[in-house]
Amino acid sequence: MSKVSPANIRSSVETILKGSEEKKRNFTETVELQIGLKNYDPQRDKRFSGTIKLPNVPRPNMSICILGDAHDLDRAKHGGVDAMSVDDLKKLNKNKKLVKKLAKKYDAFIASEVLIKQIPRLLGPGLSKAGKFPSPVSHSDDLYGKIIEVKSTIKFQLKKVLCLGVAVGHVDMAEEQLAANLSLAINFLVSLLKKGWQNIGSLVIKSTMGKPYRLY
């Protein structure tokens, strides 16, 4: 049972969107869910990690790069998406600095299914370390659909500190879209926690430049 009511979610979304409307920025603000955990010991308790696909793309401007074979390079080119071939990856020569730079340049990667097993051999552990190991795409998959799927997926990952933040939307979304993303994200997070709601200290929603709104 969610401890945050749909009405509370709606009023938080309304407040955030109204605030951004009053102070228009020259970029699209991201809306983030910030979570404070309690009764959790990251040293002893299992550090959870989970991904979920939201009904509406939270970050449409997310930059994506395709690591592809000839077929997928061609598809990427037609779709106007950045792409790299095996030869391009070999040129990085497993150089840690260059791989790190690549991981920084893009928000996410998609790789041809046939190449996915070669990625660690070609690049070393750099992309995994950055939490950006590529999602696989097969030739029968719709590449554009895959890109939307990757852009819609958010990841909750507990590291050493008891707070985390995830993008759940942006200020140009309709209220219903943002509310749907937010409630799904909260319920999924609670399902990852050992003691569910008992592990949640606070839930705050905030746009990039806006005031925080406490939900819980």
UniProtKB/Swiss-Prot annotation:
Miscellaneous: There are 2 genes for uL1 in S.pombe.
Keywords: Cytoplasm, Phosphoprotein, Ribonucleoprotein, Ribosomal protein
Modified positions (Phosphoserine) in chain numbering: S85, S128
Pfam families: Ribosomal_L1
UniProt function note: Component of the ribosome, a large ribonucleoprotein complex responsible for the synthesis of proteins in the cell. The small ribosomal subunit (SSU) binds messenger RNAs (mRNAs) and translates the encoded message by selecting cognate aminoacyl-transfer RNA (tRNA) molecules. The large subunit (LSU) contains the ribosomal catalytic site termed the peptidyl transferase center (PTC), which catalyzes the formation of peptide bonds, thereby polymerizing the amino acids delivered by tRNAs into a polypeptide chain.
Any GO MF annotation of the entry: structural constituent of ribosome
Complexes and interactors: Component of the large ribosomal subunit (LSU). Mature yeast ribosomes consist of a small (40S) and a large (60S) subunit. The 40S small subunit contains 1 molecule of ribosomal RNA (18S rRNA) and at least 33 different proteins. The large 60S subunit contains 3 rRNA molecules (25S, 5.8S and 5S rRNA) and at least 46 different proteins. uL1 forms part of the L1 stalk.
Organism whose genome encodes this protein: Schizosaccharomyces pombe (strain 972 / ATCC 24843)
Primary residence: cytoplasm
Assigned GO CC terms: cytosol; cytosolic large ribosomal subunit
GO term, biological process aspect, one: cytoplasmic translation
Cellular localization per UniProt: Cytoplasm
Protein name: Large ribosomal subunit protein uL1A
Recorded family membership: Belongs to the universal ribosomal protein uL1 family.
UniProt-listed InterPro entries: eL8/uL1-like, Ribosomal_uL1, Ribosomal_uL1-like, Ribosomal_uL1/biogenesis, Ribosomal_uL1_3-a/b-sand, Ribosomal_uL1_CS
PROSITE patterns documented for this protein: RIBOSOMAL_L1 (PS01199)
